[in-house]
Swiss-Prot record:
Carbon 2 of the heme B porphyrin ring is defined according to the Fischer nomenclature. It comes from the Bacteria. This is Protoheme IX farnesyltransferase. The chain crosses the membrane at residues 35-55, 56-76, 98-118, 120-140, 153-173, 180-200, 226-246, 248-268, 292-312. It is an enzyme of class 2 (transferase). Its main location: membrane. One of its GO terms (cellular component) is plasma membrane. One of its GO terms (molecular function) is protoheme IX farnesyltransferase activity. It is a multi-pass membrane protein. Its EC number is 2.5.1.141. Pathway: Porphyrin-containing compound metabolism; heme O biosynthesis; heme O from protoheme: step 1/1.
């Protein structure tokens, strides 16, 4: 065999991407993205002052794209973890549909586009907050905290709580108490939501080497933390009503939803073994999603109602 023939046999043909549109959409974490867009929309509509509809749509799109960029960069870095977990093994990178360099390029491009577009077309305060949100989620949470501490989701949850603040800043060019109240609600909601998931996925996290609280401290300690954070969440979510920031309709809804959330958390705390424990943690995880959507939906409906009354009043 000639040297040339031997060399030719060693050549590796360039990889042709097998990714379709659906694979790139999956990189964006569309479920998380939808929650981000919804909470950001509430923050934007609650903000005082007039805002051109085109700028409002631009702001929400940029925040949504920024969230998608963070999701893509998260999957780029965590491909090794995703491949070991049943819940995430079907994501585009572990399946070989998208390579890590492709995911990195996609995520960085979207992050740059979302921040710069928001800055140029809306304002640079909102753009800076969006850039910080992406940085916090990707660098502080994904790259640093997630693999080293069981408090990863507590600290990292700040990134998921920032979209309403970004949206408020898009309208006003500043930050005030109201968006920080929304931030606090999402921040205290995050640990019970994700620890409930971690309780019935503890084996997955242990197999992947992720130090989630049920893996490092055990399920009983996790149940106690879920209960404590849920109590804090109910109090924080109710506080804007007596403080005069949100209406009685919001307050009553918050009280009712908080009662449901607390009841679910108490069941998780009490049922510690067998199918009852598994069912309790699953129910809390599902109800927590309903809780946050319903709570923010009430605020959204109040804004719409005020607008209708102002139009016809």
């Amino acid at each position: 065999m000639s040297v040339i023939e031997s060399h030719d046999l060693g050549l590796i043909a360039p990889r042709i991407s097998e990714a379709g549109v659906a694979d790139y959409v999956a990189l964006l974490k569309p479920r998380v993205m939808s929650l981000v867009i919804f909470t950001a929309l509430v923050g934007l509509l609650l903000a005082p002052g007039s805002f051109h509809p085109v700028l409002a749509i631009t702001s929400i799109l940029c925040i949504g794209v920024g969230a998608g960029a963070a999701g893509a960069l998260n999957m780029w870095y965590e491909d090794d973890i995703d491949a070991k977990m049943t819940r995430t093994a079907n994501r585009p990178i572990p399946r070989g549909k998208i390579t890590r360099p492709e995911a990195l390029t996609f995520g960085m491009t979207l992050a740059f586009f979302s921040v710069v577009t928001l800055g140029i077309l809306v304002n640079w305060i909102a753009a800076a907050l969006l850039a910080f949100t992406i940085f916090f989620y990707v660098v502080i949470y994904t790259i640093w905290l997630k693999r080293v501490t069981a408090q990863n989701i507590v600290i990292g949850g700040a990134a998921g709580a920032l979209p309403p603040v970004v949206a408020w800043a898009a309208v006003t060019g500043s930050v005030s108490v109201e968006p920080m109240l929304l931030f606090a609600i999402i921040f205290f909601w995050t640990p019970p939501h994700f620890w409930a998931l971690a309780l019935f996925r503890a084996g997955d996290y242990a197999n992947a080497g992720v130090p989630m609280l049920p893996v490092t401290a055990g399920p009983d300690a996790t149940r106690l933390q879920i209960l404590l954070y849920t109590i804090a969440l109910v109090a924080v979510a109710l506080a804007p009503w007596p403080l005069g920031y949100f209406s009685a309709v919001y307050g009553i809804t918050s009280l009712a939803l908080g009662g449901g959330m607390l009841a679910c958390a108490l069941r998780v705390y009490r049922h510690r073994t067998g199918s009852a424990a598994l069912r309790a943690s699953r129910n809390l995880f599902r109800f927590s999603i309903l809780y946050l959507f319903a709570l923010f939906a009430v605020l959204l409906l109040e804004v719409v109602a005020r607008g209708v009354l102002a139009l016809f009043g």
